[in-house]
Amino acid sequence: MKLLAATVLLLTICSLEGALVRRQAKEPCVDNLVSQYFQTVTDYGKDLMEKVKSPELQAEAKSYFEKSKEQLTPLIKKAGTELVNFLSYFMELGTQPATQ
């Protein structure tokens, strides 16, 4: 029984000592965190710019935009036509009661 009580007492003291050490530890400075964040963003931006400069990536992006333009142009024309028809329908509704 004494061994059990001594073990519980020892575990309690160790956990309290650990909590005290954690409380006394220095918290990371916010300025350092912000500067590290901006440094990381800057490094990422530099790496991205180096990757964008490659001719393969530029050619791939150009072909992607051309293909997208080919696919979207008919859809945009169709949507524009339907919008004009839709608005003209409401314009006709507005003029009908006045003529009756």
From Swiss-Prot:
One cellular component term from this protein's GO annotations in UniProt: spherical high-density lipoprotein particle
Tissue specificity annotation: Plasma.
Chain positions found as Methionine sulfoxide: 49
Cystine residue pairs: none
Top-rank taxon: Eukaryota
Phosphoserine, modified sites: 54, 68
Location(s), subcellular: Secreted
GO BP term, pick one: positive regulation of interleukin-8 production
Main localisation: secreted
Keyword Transport: yes
Signal sequence region: 1-18
General function of this protein: May stabilize HDL (high density lipoprotein) structure by its association with lipids, and affect the HDL metabolism.
Subunit structure: Homodimer; disulfide-linked. Interacts with NAXE and NDRG1.
Name by which UniProt lists this protein: Apolipoprotein A-II
